[in-house]
């Protein structure tokens, strides 16, 4: 689907007490039962729905009504202090937005931080989710062999401590294998968003929700993975330096209806670095997935 740009697809709506920004394109088709596809971005500096998924929107909009949401604290959405753990806070905001848009059920795709939000949403509101696609998801990744924090998280913390374009470039470099994707234009765009009014305070509030003793354990989604009843596709870049591949195995074991697809020569941004393969894999899963249990061959 051509002719889609940031401004022509941009919308906003109330989500409880918040106003959330989102981008929408495409119409329902028989694929995936006609359910809308909602995408939730990651949580790095300057992250937004458009920066993560804008380039993927035309392809997915061919087959789905596709909605890219700026999560609370990111992009053009409101940036309130986080109450409790961010995954739950954002999942409830997504639910409020869907209520406002009169959308009952969705397929849900989340990247990194957005994967954690998507998983929490599916735990809270399983009846509203068709299928899940979780890309190197936060909260579910439990590294078996890599040190924690990982290289990517360390670079994220470096930027938070002393924001600069150099620190941001170092962080973005951990996102991808192909360093040609780390352009000056990308760094400038992400830095502008990361240092916009309220952005750094929102990032700090989000981050602290995973360290605060009162909300920390609510973010350990791997503990609840066995309760994720919806069909779930886990996707991972083999060279992911933020949430490394060994973090997939506990989730793969624990989620009852989980599958795993690994993109070779790919980092944390499969939707960008393996764009066409990512679209094909996700579309095939959402369109033709057949549920199979231990009792059925």
Model-identified regions with their sequence ranges:
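Flexible "cap/lid" loop of the alpha/beta hydrolase fold
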Residues: 119, 123, 130-164
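Active-site loop/oxyanion-hole signature of alpha/beta-hydrolase fold enzymes
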Residues: 23, 57-58, 68-109, 280-283
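Conserved HGGG/HGGXW glycine-rich cap/lid loop of the alpha/beta-hydrolase fold
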Residues: 18-76
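Catalytic active-site module of serine/aspartate enzymes centered on a nucleophile-bearing elbow/loop
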Residues: 258-297
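Acidic catalytic loop of the alpha/beta-hydrolase fold
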Residues: 239-243
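Gly/Ala-rich beta-loop-alpha elbow adjacent to hydrolase catalytic centers
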Residues: 110, 114, 118
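Conserved alpha/beta-hydrolase catalytic His-Asp/Glu region
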Residues: 163-226
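Short beta-strand/loop motif that positions the catalytic acidic residue
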Residues: 228, 234-236
């Amino acid at each position: 689907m051509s002719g889609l740009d940031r401004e022509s697809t941009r919308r906003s709506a109330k989500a409880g007490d918040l106003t959330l920004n989102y981008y929408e394109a495409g119409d329902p088709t028989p694929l995936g039962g006609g359910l809308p596809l909602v995408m939730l971005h990651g949580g790095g500096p300057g992250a937004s729905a458009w920066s993560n998924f804008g380039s993927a929107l035309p392809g997915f909009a061919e087959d789905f009504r596709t909605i890219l949401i700026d999560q609370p604290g990111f992009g053009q959405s409101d940036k309130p202090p986080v109450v409790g753990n961010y995954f739950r806070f954002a999942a409830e905001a997504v639910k409020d937005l869907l209520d406002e848009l009169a959308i009952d059920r969705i397929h849900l795709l989340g990247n990194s931080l957005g994967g954690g939000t998507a998983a929490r949403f599916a735990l809270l509101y399983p009846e509203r989710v068709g299928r899940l696609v979780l890309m190197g998801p936060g909260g579910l990744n439990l590294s078996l062999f890599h040190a924690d924090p990982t290289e990517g998280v360390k670079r994220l913390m470096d930027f938070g401590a002393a924001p600069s374009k150099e620190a941001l470039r170092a962080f973005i470099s951990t996102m991808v294998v192909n360093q040609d994707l780390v352009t000056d234009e990308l760094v400038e765009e992400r830095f502008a968003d990361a240092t916009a009014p309220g952005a750094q305070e929102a990032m700090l509030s989000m981050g602290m929700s995973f360290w605060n003793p009162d909300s920390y354990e609510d973010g350990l989604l791997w503990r609840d993975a066995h309760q994720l009843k919806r069909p779930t596709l886990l996707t991972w870049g083999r060279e992911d330096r933020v949430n490394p591949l060994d973090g997939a195995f506990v989730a793969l074991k624990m989620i009852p209806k989980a599958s795993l697809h690994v993109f070779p020569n790919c980092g944390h941004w499969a939707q960008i670095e393996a764009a066409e393969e990512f679209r094909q894999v996700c579309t095939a899963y959402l369109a033709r997935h057949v549920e199979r249990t231990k009792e059925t061959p």
